[in-house]
Amino acid sequence: MVKGELLYEGKAKRIFRSSEEGELWVEYKDDATAFNGEKKETLAGKARLNNDISSLIFATLAKKGIPSHFIRRLSDTEQLVKQVDIIPLEVVVRNVVAGSMAKRLGIEEGIALKKPLVEFYYKDDALGDPLVTEDHIAILDVAAAEEVAQLKQMAAAVNNELIELFATVGVQLIDFKLEFGRTQAGELLLADEISPDTCRLWDKDTKERFDKDLFRRNLGNLQEGYQEILSRLGGLYHV
């Protein structure tokens, strides 16, 4: 198998063509960004940590019957994935008030929600990735109503599994962002990554943060926080 031409470069990853049809080569970057790229820094070792954590979580979810684009880890910073057409929606699941929800609604961070909240954001950097309703999604015509229902169902299933996974290692899953894509056959698959870049993760007892808020809010060393998550998960699971 051979890495082909560069197809796309985003804030955190590069996507390459693979010599195998229907597969893509993902390379994680050491770049950390926040506020739609307004804050940016290169942090040595971040690519390896995100690749390892995301590979581990995708492999764990696969064992629980939740399909994703992930095929296998290729190197410290690379993984092989199934080619999908990404749906331009970020699916955010919230278990505890934090981040933009706290700011938007004037609610104190750290308050547990009575039930998980699922939100949709339209992926458009120029618009600032706005929060959208299901009616907005229909107007934008980016996903059919039955697909939106399936996205919510899959997001809820991922939430249940991740809550259990992180609780086992003393970590509280505050909220997280998912992306999904369609295969050529029309199957919806979990895509992108699941890592401290896309999840808020707090120590269950001390509420210490192990996620991108370390960088976003200048709360501490990002690599140390991510390494703590990998070390805790690595004690139980192996890719």
Swiss-Prot record:
Gene3D superfamilies: ATP-grasp fold, B domain, Phosphorylase Kinase, domain 1. It holds the Pfam family SAICAR_synt. Keywords: ATP-binding, Ligase, Nucleotide-binding, Purine biosynthesis. Pathway: Purine metabolism; IMP biosynthesis via de novo pathway; 5-amino-1-(5-phospho-D-ribosyl)imidazole-4-carboxamide from 5-amino-1-(5-phospho-D-ribosyl)imidazole-4-carboxylate: step 1/2. Its EC number is 6.3.2.6. It is an enzyme of class 6 (ligase). The keyword Amino-acid biosynthesis does not apply. It catalyses: 5-amino-1-(5-phospho-D-ribosyl)imidazole-4-carboxylate + L-aspartate + ATP = (2S)-2-[5-amino-1-(5-phospho-beta-D-ribosyl)imidazole-4-carboxamido]succinate + ADP + phosphate + 2 H(+). GO terms for molecular function: ATP binding; phosphoribosylaminoimidazolesuccinocarboxamide synthase activity. PROSITE patterns: SAICAR_SYNTHETASE_1, SAICAR_SYNTHETASE_2. InterPro entries: SAICAR_synt/ADE2_N, SAICAR_synt_PurC, SAICAR_synth, SAICAR_synthetase, SAICAR_synthetase_CS. One of its GO terms (biological process) is cobalamin biosynthetic process. Belongs to the SAICAR synthetase family. This is Phosphoribosylaminoimidazole-succinocarboxamide synthase. It comes from Shouchella clausii (strain KSM-K16).
